[in-house]
């Protein structure tokens, strides 16, 4: 019953290191609060470039060179890099991104990477030390979004879909819809679908 669910469900999410739900600590108040798990370009920039947040986050590429390694090896390298960032560099927001892929690289499917990283961190006993954010061109609709959240993502940035929405708003001037408003409408529809 999606009409009544909105009164008892929330899309609010938190990023950062989590503590025990049984013991209240100051660390639990040090989380980044988001009204929606769907990031905009501005909120992504705040996570990666903002003065107070960039020390908490790190971007991990989800692409690899097929010449250098297999899919399994690439996944292991990603997991080990993330473990190092969490333990040694105290990063609490891990951003898995396929955005800056080069021509000689292949992109790993975002759900595969997310599932592998999520379970690797659980096995290592450090899953609650960081939130996972996925930046992917694969996310297009509310089903894709729901799958990513179910696989362990705290937030996503569907940059390619948002860019397409922006382009469509510019190409269809008769709609009288600014690119920002079109992207906001798209994010609202994803939230509603979620």
Predicted regions and their residues:
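Conserved structured catalytic cores and adjacent interaction surfaces
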Residues: 56, 67-73, 77, 83-144, ...
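Flexible loop/turn segments at secondary-structure boundaries
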Residues: 6-7, 15-17, 66-69, 101-105, ...
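Generic amphipathic alpha-helical segments used as scaffolds and interaction surfaces in large
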Residues: 62-73, 104, 177, 181-185
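Extended, highly charged accessory segments
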Residues: 1-78, 83, 87, 95
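A broadly tuned "polar low-complexity/structure-edge" signature
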Residues: 7-9, 13-16, 58, 115, ...
């Amino acid at each position: 019953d999606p009409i009544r669910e909105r009164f008892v469900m929330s899309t609010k999410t938190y990023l950062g290191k989590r503590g025990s739900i049984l013991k209240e600590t100051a660390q639990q108040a040090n989380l980044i609060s988001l009204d929606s798990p769907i990031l905009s370009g501005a909120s992504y920039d705040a996570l990666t470039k903002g003065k107070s947040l960039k020390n908490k986050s790190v971007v991990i590429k989800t692409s690899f060179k097929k010449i250098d390694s297999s899919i399994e090896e690439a996944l292991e390298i990603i997991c080990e890099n993330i473990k190092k960032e969490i333990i040694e560099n105290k990063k609490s927001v891990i951003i898995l991104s396929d955005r800056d892929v080069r021509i000689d690289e292949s992109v790993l499917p975002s759900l595969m990477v997310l599932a592998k990283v999520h379970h690797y961190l659980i096995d290592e006993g450090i899953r609650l030390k960081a939130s996972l954010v996925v930046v992917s061109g694969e996310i297009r609709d509310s089903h894709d979004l729901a799958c990513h959240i179910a696989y362990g993502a705290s937030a996503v940035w569907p940059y390619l879909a948002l860019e397409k929405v922006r382009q469509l708003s510019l190409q269809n001037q008769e709609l009288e819809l600014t690119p920002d408003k079109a992207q906001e409408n798209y994010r609202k529809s994803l939230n509603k679908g979620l």
